[in-house]
From Swiss-Prot:
Name assigned to this protein: Olfactory receptor 4D10
Transmembrane parts of this sequence: 26-49, 58-79, 101-120, 140-158, 196-219, 236-258, 270-289
Chain's gene name: OR4D10
InterPro entries reported in the protein's UniProt record: GPCR_Rhodpsn, GPCR_Rhodpsn_7TM, Olfact_rcpt, Olfactory_Receptors
Localization annotation: Cell membrane
Keywords: Cell membrane, G-protein coupled receptor, Glycoprotein, Membrane, Olfaction, Receptor, Sensory transduction, Transducer, Transmembrane, Transmembrane helix
Natural source organism: Homo sapiens
Keyword Protein biosynthesis: no
GO cellular component: plasma membrane
Known glycosylation sites: N5
Residue intervals annotated with topology Cytoplasmic: 50-57, 121-139, 220-235, 290-311
Membrane topology: Multi-pass membrane protein
Length: 311
């Protein structure tokens, strides 16, 4: 009966990050700078890995895939946020909202599975160095990458399949700056208790479990190379530290958002900005600043693209 008497809303209205015009302009410039830097940083990694034959290894192949995902993840929300910061009325159509949610959870799932594959790569590299090339062959890496994208697709389609049949008759105001399941679900004109539990389980609890499994896996990895000599152990620790930092930046905000009842809290928008905008920016910095191999490859690429004038 609810669906029969329900006229589905045609759009949602965002309250956005702020209602203050001056603050909106400052945020616009800041987020534009962050977005452009994110694109350039991840594109630089992709071009370097593609052009430098020394980086044609499983670890950098997986990093290349993560950079693609980070560009996509940032592009799902940030361009719309930039437009809204300059707009008086911040709206999004019903179909666009659900498309944004689908893509958001698709790429978010890809990020989670890709970080897991990268942990597997480090484990094999450190624990089974003699068999590394066989276990992490190019075909296997491609298969794992495809599996990460399929996993993200399945995760996302489950979210949308649960939300789409619900009656959205109004209200249609979202106190956020992008469409996400925990916000949109609260607008459904029906009892959402069971669905909220399913969403928390599918997003929050699984994300929390996955995070601790990854942390444990890296602790195990770091305990493996004790028998290795200094340089090999230092390189392993440096690489794993970068991975742990990225995993923490990605998972902790997600756990805060999804592993609790879907009630609005004062810190929600700031935390959402952290993992939708800031995390894709920091990933390339983290993976390059402590990676001498990547920095050397970038310098070689620069010399090839910008030849020195010196004779």
């Amino acid at each position: 009966m609810e669906m029969e008497n329900c006229t589905r809303v045609k759009e949602f209205i965002f309250l956005g990050l702020t209602q203050n015009r001056e603050v909106s302009l400052v945020l616009f410039l800041f987020l534009l700078l962050v977005y452009v830097t994110t694109l350039l940083g991840n594109l630089l990694i992709m071009v370097t890995v593609t052009c430098e034959s020394r980086l044609h290894t499983p670890m950098y192949f997986l990093l290349h895939n993560l950079s693609i995902a980070d560009i996509c993840f940032s592009s799902i929300t940030v361009p719309k946020v930039l437009v809204d910061l300059l707009s008086e009325r911040k709206t999004i159509s019903f179909n666009h909202c659900f498309t944004q949610m689908f893509l958001f959870h698709l790429i978010g799932g890809v990020d989670v599975f890709s970080l897991s594959v990268m942990a597997l790569d480090r484990y094999v590299a450190i624990s089974k160095p003699l068999h590394y090339a066989t276990i992490m062959s190019r075909d296997h890496c491609i298969g794992l990458t495809v599996a990460a994208w399929l996993g993200g697709f399945v995760h996302s389609i489950v979210q949308i399949s649960l939300l789409l049949p619900l009656p959205f008759c109004g209200p249609n105001v979202l106190d956020t700056f992008y469409c996400d399941v925990h916000r949109v679900l609260k607008l459904a004109h029906t009892d959402i208790f069971i669905l909220e539990l399913l969403m928390i389980s599918n997003n929050g609890l699984l994300t929390t479990l996955w995070f601790f499994l990854l942390l444990v896996s890296y602790i195990v990895i770091l305990s493996l190379p004790k028998s290795q000599a200094g340089e090999g152990r230092r390189k392993a620790i440096s690489t794993c530290t970068s991975h742990i930092t990225v995993v923490t930046l990605h998972f902790v905000p997600c756990i805060y958002v999804y592993a609790r009842p879907f009630t609005a809290l004062p810190m929600d928008k700031a935390i959402s900005v952290t993992f939708t905008v800031i995390s894709p920016l920091l990933n390339p910095l983290i993976y390059t600043l402590r990676n001498h191999e990547m920095k050397s490859a970038m310098r070689r690429l620069k010399r090839r693209l910008v030849p020195s004038d010196r004779k």
